[in-house]
From Swiss-Prot:
Alphabetical GO biological process terms: mitochondrial translational elongation
Name the record gives this protein: Elongation factor G, mitochondrial
Family, similarity comment: Belongs to the TRAFAC class translation factor GTPase superfamily. Classic translation factor GTPase family. EF-G/EF-2 subfamily.
Alphabetized UniProt keyword annotations: Elongation factor, GTP-binding, Mitochondrion, Nucleotide-binding, Protein biosynthesis, Transit peptide
Top-rank taxon, per record: Eukaryota
GO cellular component, one term: mitochondrion
Name of the gene: MEF1
Source organism: Debaryomyces hansenii (strain ATCC 36239 / CBS 767 / BCRC 21394 / JCM 1990 / NBRC 0083 / IGC 2968) (Yeast)
Length: 769
């Protein structure tokens, strides 16, 4: 839980996750007539420990919703598309937009089409063939003569842009997890799965690239079960394989579906299943029912009685189990070959939740008690919305907002909770990639955007006349792992600072600080590509050429043994001087840093103890060994001394800083380096060479998987050893090798590296002197 709370909005340190989860959902009971009033009921009870308890709360809220709100929610789905890099997310999304009539022609990602995919609207995205920013759109899908409205967000697959996935999943109700039929579950698939679990996102799974040589959907499903530890079963089997892929058989109702037409836009249904697939269909159907019986009580009862469940019973069980996050139905096809995408849209309608089937909570910060509140997905309730994404547009800052409660009208006012300022909604739009369509109002469960609002990503907005001040929690923000110095080549006219401020506002994982010692601006982020993209954006969007330093690893400093300290700070230079004495102990701690005190007899007054805490925080920013942040230190002050004239807050802050340094150096200090999870894929003939390369950089191989044509090596390597790795990998695989890396943990670096880093730091300090 503490890991999540690190990303909490600054509204309140006690803010909890807004999404219903094991972290905290409280039962609020409200009468229907109170929906139009500005005050919601706050009958708070225990945290639901199971989905059944959570469902009781949802059902209670829905029983009191007006029919109009139920109907609008029934036709709405907020979904994201997530996957490992190059699994075909953007290609899949392009087909969704085409088949829903949102676009009139299909365009491909870089390398196949001069235009570029609709959702990759940045020039950099189209040039590099990757998604950098999550892009939002909306479209409509007709199923059973009913029109359904989708708010759809396409997310990046590269780990460097993981915050885009975090912010999208934070506001979505369901997702499509795209898995490659050849490579199966890969490193970033595992990361995306972890992010979906963090926000309790139900998902349907689409096995893509079924037209590729070596595709094996059932191996991929097995990996979903084993690696993601998510019960999964196919609800389709493919008709044909690889280049002969023609369609799929829906095993629930035993109907063959063929994609026809020049772009697969026509679906031909046939109850006559190909003869060679009948046994496979029955086998996979039996496996589906067996898997559902493990996760759904109603199907379990039918299964144990030896009866065959009906089509309606199977579909209802899949929906219940999927929304309860106990199961994921698996579909298959090929987005590039225009096969199977429409079936996924049907599955989104059938199996993913509508907004009123998800429990969202906020925290009422209008009182000191900070009561937790269940949000009501009704347009009649007071407005509550979360700003989850910012972009700089031609009309100023564009703010994406998810409406959780109430409605937002063009021309109306809302309050920015953090600042208390009243904000006018002068323009309200729905986004389609980088295009927009004006709307007059949006209701509960919708996603929209507005202009001219000064806020940060993760801020909450409430209705102007709301009595409650409901704060939504923000998304989880991971720590930066790499830094570099940056400076404009030419004299800065203010654009450099403007760009830095804007990028920080847009992206919480992009950090900027000024190092007073080196007099350099330091930018930090999630990887080399992450920072490289921002340097390139500076040039394109602001016309600023920048000089960058060598990438620096974000090391951490830690202690490995307990120690005590007794430190006195004395300074006399005429007049009142400075005096403070602090006594205590310091010991290693797993994870976060901690400051504590237990002073008997008032030897150190309360105001000076607060200064000690600030001195501790200051000391953590720059460790005594190499000037990097300190991790896992617990400082406890249990005694001290003051002077009637010379003691001050500054004295005790300085004394704590000195005591920290003294104790730290006596506590067997070590330097920690980031260890990355690395996944390398290459043709089989290069396996020996790649394994040798991993061993050469000191990596630890965790797993090797051999496919028909390619192999995959998963290893743990220090980030320091990964600089230049892409060049080495290209050289030893004739340009055919690929790799991804993701931060895993901090670990103690080798003694020789520690000595080298300390020597370099001391030399740097001597040069400055």
């Amino acid at each position: 839980m503490s890991k999540f709370l690190r990303g909490i909005s600054s509204i309140s340190s006690a803010s909890l996750k807004a999404r219903a989860s094991n972290f905290g959902v409280f039962h609020g009971v409200c009468s229907a007539r109170n929906l139009h009033q500005s005050r919601l009921c706050l009958n708070v009870s225990k945290i639901p420990e199971t989905y059944e308890e959570e469902k009781e709360i949802i059902d209670d809220i829905n029983s009191k919703l007006p029919e109009k709100d139920i109907l609008s929610s029934t036709r709405l789905r907020n979904i994201g598309v997530s996957a490992h890099i190059d699994s075909g997310k953007t290609t899949f999304t392009e087909r969704v937009l085409f088949y829903t009539g949102r676009i009139k022609a299909i365009h491909e990602v870089r390398g196949r089409d001069a235009v570029g995919a609709t959702m990759d609207h940045m020039d950099l995205e189209r040039e590099k063939g990757i998604t950098i920013q999550s892009a939002a759109t909306f479209c409509s899908w007709d199923k059973d003569n009913k029109d359904y409205h989708f708010n759809l967000i396409d997310t990046p697959g590269h780990i460097d842009f993981t915050i885009e996935v975090e912010r999208a999943l934070r506001v979505l109700d369901g997702a499509v997890l795209v898995v490659c039929a050849v490579a199966g579950v890969q490193s970033q698939t595992v990361t995306v799965d972890r992010q979906m679990r963090r926000y309790n996102i139900p998902r349907v799974t689409f096995i893509n690239k079924m037209d590729r040589m070596g595709s094996d959907p059932f191996r991929a499903i097995e990996q979903v079960n084993l690696k993601l530890k998510t019960p999964a079963a196919a609800i389709q089997v493919p008709i044909g394989a690889e280049s002969e892929l023609k369609g799929v058989v829906n095993i629930i109702d035993r109907v063959a579906l063929y994609n026809e037409g020049s772009q697969g836009e026509e679906i031909r249904a046939d109850t006559n299943i190909p003869e060679d697939l009948k046994d496979l269909v029955e086998e996979k159907r039996a496996l589906l029912i067996e898997t559902l019986a493990d996760v759904d009580e109603e199907i379990a009862d039918v299964y144990l009685e030896g009866e065959e469940p009906s089509v309606e019973q199977i579909k209802a069980a899949i929906r219940r189990a999927t929304i309860a996050r106990r199961f994921t139905p698996v579909l298959m096809g090929s987005a590039l070959a225009n096969k199977g995408v429409q079936n996924v849209l049907d599955a989104v309608v059938d199996y993913l939740p509508q907004p009123n089937e998800i429990l969202n909570t906020g925290l009422d910060v209008s009182t000191e008690e900070e009561k937790r509140v269940n949000l009501i997905p009704s347009s009649a309730a007071p407005f509550v919305g979360l700003a989850f994404k910012l972009e700089e547009g031609k009309y100023g800052q564009l703010t994406y907002i998810r409406v959780y409660q109430g409605k937002l009208k063009k021309g109306s006012y809302m309050n920015h909770l953090k600042s208390g300022k009243k904000v006018k909604v002068s323009r309200l739009v729905r986004m389609h990639s980088n295009d927009m369509e004006d709307v007059d109002e949006v209701g509960a469960g919708e996603i929209c955007a507005t202009f001219g609002i000064d806020c940060a990503s993760g801020d909450t907005f409430i209705g102007q006349n709301s009595e409650q001040q409901i704060a939504m929690s923000s998304m989880f923000v991971p720590e930066a792992v790499i830094s570099l110095s940056i400076a404009p080549k030419a004299k800065d006219n203010g654009s450099f600072s403007k760009a830095m401020n804007r990028f920080q506002k847009e992206d919480p994982t992009f950090r900027v600080k000024y190092d007073a010692e080196s007099k350099e601006t330091i930018i930090s982020g999630m990887g080399e590509l992450h920072l490289e993209i921002y340097v390139e954006r500076m040039k394109r969007e602001y016309g600023i050429d920048c000089i960058t330093g060598k990438p620096q690893v974000a090391y951490r400093e830690a202690i490995t043994a307990p120690t005590s300290f007794d430190y006195t700070h004395k300074k006399q230079s005429g007049g009142s001087g400075q005096y403070a004495r602090v006594v205590g102990e310091m010991k290693p701690l797993d994870g976060e840093n901690k400051f504590s005190q237990h002073i008997v007899g008032g030897k150190i007054p309360e105001k000076f103890l607060f200064a000690c805490s600030k001195g501790f925080d200051d000391s953590l920013e720059k460790g005594p060994l190499i000037g990097h942040r300190v991790l896992g230190a617990h400082m406890h002050i249990n005694d001290g001394q003051t002077h009637v004239v010379d003691s001050s807050e500054l004295s005790f802050r300085t004394a704590t800083h000195g005591a920290f340094k003294q104790a730290f150096l006596n506590a067997q200090p070590v330097i920690l380096e980031p260890i990355m999870s690395v996944e390398i894929s290459a043709p089989n003939e290069f396996q020996g060479t790649v394994v040798g390369l991993v061993n050469k950089i000191g990596g630890m191989i965790m797993e090797t998987v051999n496919g028909q044509d390619e192999f995959t090596v998963t290893a743990e390597c220090s980030l320091n050893s990964m600089f230049g790795f892409s060049t080495s990998l290209r050289a030893c695989t004739q340009g055919k090798g690929e790799f991804t890396l993701e931060f895993n943990k901090y670990a103690q670096c080798a003694p020789h590296l520690q000595k080298q880093l300390i020597a370099e730091h001391e030399k740097k300090l001597q040069t400055k002197k």
